[in-house]
């Protein structure tokens, strides 16, 4: 009820202004009596995945807390894991505004943010100050002005800097809002990137005395053959996990709606069916050998259960959280 009232106010604002205001308020109120409005004590539903123990299988997807400013707030809401980022080596402002749109009737969101963030060094300082008990994922990407043929260098820079502080590292090669980025999902380009990442992982494991798993985040807009090839690359390179999926460029489910024609990636309920199908295809190809984190349209317990029945070991929420608030996490975890 309280969240519905707050949402009504936030939804009167431009979508990005509402997002920024929410982040400011979470930073301001966490640790004060006001955080009782969103702090939740949830039952333990422990899951072993990627060599880590998650207190429950419901996580916050990357993109909401790009700079790691509100880890404590999301931890207080009971998430089993929180994925911050996407972060790049250098700060960048992202694409021109407006770049975030709500499709309220479909409970969807279109964004073309473009990896706006304050840079990896800023994120690390925020992580070092935070106190939390959930698993922390850090999602890394490349700067827009880094040529795609040198993209691996950006991932390696970020990986080296976040490794010490991450529970796992998510490698984002599937955002539709950075030109050319999705080409890294295919063939030799993917294999070359994964080889470099695994080499760096081994080097950093020796340096820090701990193994931090790597998860690859993929797009929903892939053919069955492309998914099969990605799976072979994941297996061959011993990648620890796969996150399925990022946002979609397809507009079939929202055709004719206000903002449907806006460029960018579509998330939320319109993505649920396709992202779940990708999870199912991954499970078939990977045969349980590599864990799957299912994301895309998880806006209820039933949607989360669909992802898990399709083969997801963990699930993440983002758009569903925007529309339903912390109560969504509670509803999923309590019913598992």
Curated annotation (Swiss-Prot):
Q: What is its EC number?
A: 1.3.5.2
Q: Which Gene3D superfamilies does the protein's record reference?
A: Aldolase class I
Q: Where in the cell is it found?
A: Cell membrane
List, alphabetically, the GO terms of the cellular component aspect: cytoplasm; plasma membrane
Please give the pathway this protein is involved in: Pyrimidine metabolism; UMP biosynthesis via de novo pathway; orotate from (S)-dihydroorotate (quinone route): step 1/1
The molecular function terms in GO held by this entry are: dihydroorotate dehydrogenase (quinone) activity
- Catalytic reaction list: (S)-dihydroorotate + a quinone = orotate + a quinol
**Alphabetic keyword roster:** Cell membrane, Flavoprotein, FMN, Membrane, Oxidoreductase, Pyrimidine biosynthesis
Alphabetical list of InterPro entries matching this protein: Aldolase_TIM, DHO_dehydrogenase, Dihydroorotate_DH_1_2, Dihydroorotate_DH_2, Dihydroorotate_DH_cat, Dihydroorotate_DH_CS
What domain of life does the native source organism fall in? Answer: Bacteria
What cofactor(s) does the depicted protein rely on? FMN
Q: Which sites bind FMN?
A: 62-66, 86, 139, 172, 217, 245, 268, 297, 318-319
GO annotation, biological process = 'de novo' pyrimidine nucleobase biosynthetic process; 'de novo' UMP biosynthetic process
Q: Where is the active site?
A: 175 (nucleophile)
State the PANTHER family in the record: DIHYDROOROTATE DEHYDROGENASE (QUINONE), MITOCHONDRIAL (PTHR48109:SF4), DIHYDROOROTATE DEHYDROGENASE (QUINONE), MITOCHONDRIAL-RELATED (PTHR48109)
Give the protein's function. Answer: Catalyzes the conversion of dihydroorotate to orotate with quinone as electron acceptor.
What's this protein's family per the entry? Belongs to the dihydroorotate dehydrogenase family. Type 2 subfamily.
Q: List the protein's name.
A: Dihydroorotate dehydrogenase (quinone)
Organism from which the protein derives: Vibrio vulnificus (strain YJ016)
Gene name tied to this protein: pyrD
């Amino acid at each position: 009820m309280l969240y519905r009232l707050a949402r009504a106010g936030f939804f009167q604002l431009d979508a990005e202004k509402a997002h920024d205001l929410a982040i400011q308020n979470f930073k301001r109120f966490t640790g004060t009596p006001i955080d009782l409005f969103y702090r939740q004590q949830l039952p333990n539903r422990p899951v072993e995945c990627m060599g880590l123990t998650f207190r429950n299988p419901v996580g916050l997807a990357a993109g909401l807390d790009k700079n790691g400013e509100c880890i404590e707030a999301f931890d207080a809401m009971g998430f089993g894991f929180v994925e911050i980022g996407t972060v790049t080596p250098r700060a960048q402002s992202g694409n021109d505004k407006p770049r975030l749109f709500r499709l309220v009737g479909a409970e969807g969101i279109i964004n073309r943010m473009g990896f706006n963030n304050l840079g990896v060094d800023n994120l690390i300082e925020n992580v070092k100050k935070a106190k939390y008990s959930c698993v922390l994922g850090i999602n890394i990407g490349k700067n827009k002005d880094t040529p795609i043929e040198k993209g691996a260098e950006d991932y390696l820079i970020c990986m080296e800097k976040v490794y010490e502080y991450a529970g796992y590292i998510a490698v984002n090669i599937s955002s539709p809002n950075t030109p050319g980025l999705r080409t890294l999902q295919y063939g030799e380009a993917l294999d070359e990137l994964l080889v470099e990442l695994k080499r760096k992982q081994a080097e950093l494991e020796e340096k820090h005395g701990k193994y931090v798993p790597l998860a690859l985040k993929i797009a929903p807009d892939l053919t069955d053959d492309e998914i099969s090839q990605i799976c072979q690359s994941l297996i061959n390179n011993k990648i620890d996990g796969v996150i399925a999926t990022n946002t979609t460029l397809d507009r079939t489910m929202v055709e004719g709606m206000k903002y449907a024609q806006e460029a960018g990636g579509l998330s939320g309920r319109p993505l649920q069916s396709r992202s779940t199908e990708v999870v199912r295809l991954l499970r078939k190809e990977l045969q349980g050998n590599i864990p799957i984190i299912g994301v895309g349209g998880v806006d209820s317990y039933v949607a989360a259960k669909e992802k898990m029945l399709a083969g997801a070991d963990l699930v993440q929420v983002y758009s569903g959280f925007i529309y339903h608030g912390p109560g969504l996490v509670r509803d999923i975890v309590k019913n598992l």
